[in-house]
């Protein structure tokens, strides 16, 4: 019953058309299987005709011609049958897979957020089902199932013919089926287990490579290249060992197929007894022997394909389970109350809540909160106090464990979920955008909005100006997850998306956190206006977003401890007051440096002219540097001619295995024609009249067949193991060298779209795998095939050159037929992969942004996108289905026609006295088997083409010269640096936007041992200063000096050992907290006490020790298991452990709440003592105590001095204007 349920899961997506296609396909597959046994029957009669020839027989050609004509009739029938098989299965496979992907993704988007927290550990889980699972089932339906049916019917048909012709021999041969099945089943089981382990081993190595490449700035800054490559190499060693085991298993399995020769030997011996004792003809005996071995082999292939049944069952059940799952909070459920009018009054009554993924942690304990309609309520509190949980519960991402949440006195549990969410607009702290245009992203908020409404929403969110500056305006593509936009730009698009919805309830979770102060002021005014008449819930660190709130609620340990207006709470002098005083203390003495316009009067022009974030420029301009530099680096522009000779040179350390492998392949290749030649001789023996001669010759050939079986076993093991050894170690060497080389490239190379982390990791995985296949499998097959062809042609030309020439002339037809059939299947697979790749991208994006999709109820919009991306591949697949049917039919019919020609022409030569029957028997089998071997090798042309591209890709990477050499042998290696930094007349523009100059004749002196703050508006070049100091980029003109020496003259990795960087967005690696802190030192020998001290100094020790595993807590992919503030503190601890001479802080405390920021800032100021420090920050707390503050504007330093001296300049000073503007934004 369970098996039937599993089978139903495979076919559950079939409709009436699909069942009709599968019915016709069944007829075709079964018919295809019976074609070969029918041809065997005709061949038996032909061989008997040839064996009974006498020179006086004038009627010899009549039965030959008659049977050859019968073969042509079979050829015509086979075209129709094989067309049905090829077309119907291919078509229904694509149709069912497309419906499966659509239904699965729809079911995924239907699930509640709690499901993703509990059951989806990573996006790849969903991608696997959308891509791999659907592809497994499509491949099963299109290829594996018809193959199973065809082979099963071929087995039945062969034994039917065997019993019809010679039942005694068939019965004797029947038990040998078991011996024919064992090798395939044995290898199949071993291969599945080893292949799974190899994937798991390489996934670990691939994860290390992906981390290194996606976080390349962090890897470079902490000089962790060697550490990453060593980890990568260690991880690869496991897959190498498994690959050798796989090669050995393959050699044993293929060698065990030599049992066919032994079975043939026994059956020919028994068949000789049938000839002598019962008078059976030689053609009948030899054909029945072929039927027995062919039938057993066909059954083995059918059974070996049954593992695909199992894989398809598992994939189908996994998909079916998701499709049938009804979530607890079902957005598709249209039942539920819809309020005719909604005021927006929100009430939390005695709410207790635990997250499904953390049931041991109580977030709310008896929470009571009332939010009047049309009022703005701000939620404040420490990290983990439950602020964001309020919003999640209100949107019904989760349901509380106890208590009720009401809107207008109606429980939200009784409301229709989709309608409920449609009444809310949400802007999150980390905006989620989709890989489509800006306009389409804004329309996610309201699908039927007009373009004018889109523009108005963009204007209201202060996004219209920067959108208009793009060449394509609102049609500008934002890239995957908005990668082409800066943080502030993404946030403003997200705000526009929320405003266009005109929601009754507005939810703002750090909605302005990514904006500079000028943009924040304008956007905050827009949000304030949008809040009028709406119930608004605000979560924010900055006071500017909560001071004007009607009600401020202070959360602590899951309860509201204070509530009231700002003034009322200040009078209470409680927890809120302490938070305000803490922030005021810092705001009164310092100024924001990255976000503010220079003067209030100059703000508008700055906003219009400088509306790009430096990180946006860093991303978008760097690729132009590659373009410009490529003019002077020919190898980057000109594709290499693939050098297979050079590839072989990389395999030189394995030369002994190469020699052994080639010798074994040559000997193995000779086996097939020798076996066919011997079989032909044995057939001619059957037609001898002298029984003693039959016995004597049979004994010789039987011993020869047994010898070939043993010989094949040992040469196959030697061949497969040797070439696997070559392939595995070459693959490991290529991957190591590629990653090592990639981690020397300048940063702007990684900013190229084609050099994304995903693309590079794909190159590491796929290109190296193709090269391994090229060396480990294809070269082995090529050497073996060359040996086969040479031996076959030599034997043929010696025995009967006329017949041999004709046989050779038709071989290309057979080869082309096999080749087209194999290549066509590969092309079909490629089309399927294209469809699933597009679906996978969409699924990955949808799962990554599931909260956004859930918030805006955008499931149908995503499904329309899926329909759009699958439309092209679906049309192409329909065309390919016709081609598959036509070519499969043509292949089978042409092969049958060539057999008819060979029999007819051989008979003609015998009738004319130009060849004897014995020669025909010897040569016919040789070229029949050789043609198939050549065809198998012929399919390598696509593999060779693919291999050529991969070899080209590999050497393009290995031969590329980086423009910023990290291991320059002539570079100055320093033991210690003082830290004096000088920028002298520096010109700089990011490569992707060479016309937008960041620095123009820029000069600044950063004194050793002193702290220097860099402030100024967006795009003034603050972060670029750090990029140039770290030498992520080089200036176009001018010099950057450290300790009086041009930075380009230093040994770069040696220089970076003395610098440390803490970025705005902390990068952690998938490892433990301890391992991430240890990245601060190149050495792996670090005392535990040093790690703990670094954690304490960074204010991280307390939260780390509160975790169940302490410093051994796993951080997750990119630190996903930790909050932003926790990640930042670990990053700071990593920097503290490095103890650098130059400290670079780019928004180092931006992710921390006020209390944590104060402690960490004290720690940083302690660490900064005696070090050259360059500080960039939005918050004033990080620059108020700096020795020097430099104000940048339009790529130049317009003011510098201490905080006090710059304020003393009064209203005419740029810095004074920044301070004034900030105070206005903070306190208005």
Swiss-Prot record:
Coiled-coil ranges per UniProt: none
ABC transporter domain residues: 346-582, 981-1219
MF GO annotations: ABC-type transporter activity; ATP binding; ATP hydrolysis activity
Cellular component GO terms, alphabetical: membrane
InterPro entries in the record: AAA+_ATPase, ABC1_TM_dom, ABC1_TM_sf, ABC_transporter-like_ATP-bd, ABC_transporter-like_CS, P-loop_NTPase
One Pfam family this sequence matches: ABC_tran
Keywords of this entry: ATP-binding, Glycoprotein, Membrane, Nucleotide-binding, Repeat, Transmembrane, Transmembrane helix, Transport
Binding-site positions, ATP 2: 1016-1023
Subcellular localization, as worded in the UniProt entry: Membrane
Membrane disposition: Multi-pass membrane protein
Membrane-traversing stretches: 22-42, 69-89, 145-167, 171-193, 251-271, 283-303, 667-687, 700-720, 781-801, 805-825, 881-901, 920-940
Binding positions for ATP 1 per the UniProt entry: 381-388
Stored Gene3D superfamilies: ABC transporter type 1, transmembrane domain, P-loop containing nucleotide triphosphate hydrolases
Glycosylation sites: 529, 593, 628, 755, 827, 1001
Occurrences of domain ABC transmembrane type-1 (ranges): 22-311, 658-946
Family per record: Belongs to the ABC transporter superfamily. ABCB family. Multidrug resistance exporter (TC 3.A.1.201) subfamily.
Protein name: ABC transporter B family member 16
Taxonomic source organism: Arabidopsis thaliana
Lineage: Eukaryota, Viridiplantae, Streptophyta, Embryophyta, Tracheophyta
